[in-house]
Curated annotation (Swiss-Prot):
Function: This protein is located at the 30S-50S ribosomal subunit interface and may play a role in the structure and function of the aminoacyl-tRNA binding site.
Matching HAMAP family: Ribosomal_bL19
Top-rank taxon: Bacteria
Gene3D superfamilies: 2.30.30.790
BP GO annotations: translation
Family to which this protein belongs: Belongs to the bacterial ribosomal protein bL19 family.
Name of the featured protein: Large ribosomal subunit protein bL19
A cellular-component GO term for this protein: cytosolic large ribosomal subunit
Coiled coil regions in record: none
Alphabetized InterPro entries for the sequence: Ribosomal_bL19, Ribosomal_bL19_CS, Ribosomal_bL19_sf, Translation_prot_SH3-like_sf
GO molecular function, one term: structural constituent of ribosome
PROSITE patterns referenced in this protein's UniProt entry, alphabetically: RIBOSOMAL_L19 (PS01015)
Key word Ribonucleoprotein present: yes
Length: 130
């Protein structure tokens, strides 16, 4: 009986692992990313970009999601993206930011220059500048 249960569990893991994306880039809180989302309008699909600051990452595996914050027409908008969802077309890293927290909710209270995040330059670019 236990062998049947383990076969069922293994098949569930196989199904989940087949749905995981393998083209995701490595990013964390404080980074600026662009998420391209597929949107269906009628019978057509189009790509909509959402570029902003990562303020939270959570979950693992199929439940991995990220909260991105951007300013749109003077109002800040936060959107949660499940990254292994089929509606996500691509994720692009724009720049790396240096923060000391994994969830940077404090950025919501800051405004102006106080809300800036220090940029980390990749090592290859840093060598080229020097």
């Amino acid at each position: 009986m236990s062998s049947k249960a383990t076969k069922t569990v293994k098949s569930k893991f196989d199904i989940i692992n087949n749905q995981l994306r393998d083209d995701l880039i490595d990013f964390r809180s404080g980074d600026t990313i662009r998420v391209d989302v597929k949107i269906k309008e009628g019978d057509k699909f189009r790509i909509q970009s959402f570029e902003g600051l990562v303020i939270k990452t959570q979950g693992s595996g199929i439940t991995y999601s990220v909260v991105v914050r951007k300013m749109s027409n003077g109002v800040f908008v936060e959107r949660t993206f499940p990254l292994h969802s089929p509606i996500i077309d691509s994720v692009t890293l724009i720049k790396r930011g240096k923060v000391r927290r994994s969830r940077i909710y404090y950025i919501r209270k800051l405004s102006g220059k106080a809300a800036r995040i220090k940029e980390i330059m990749p090592t290859k670019q840093a060598k080229e500048i020097k």
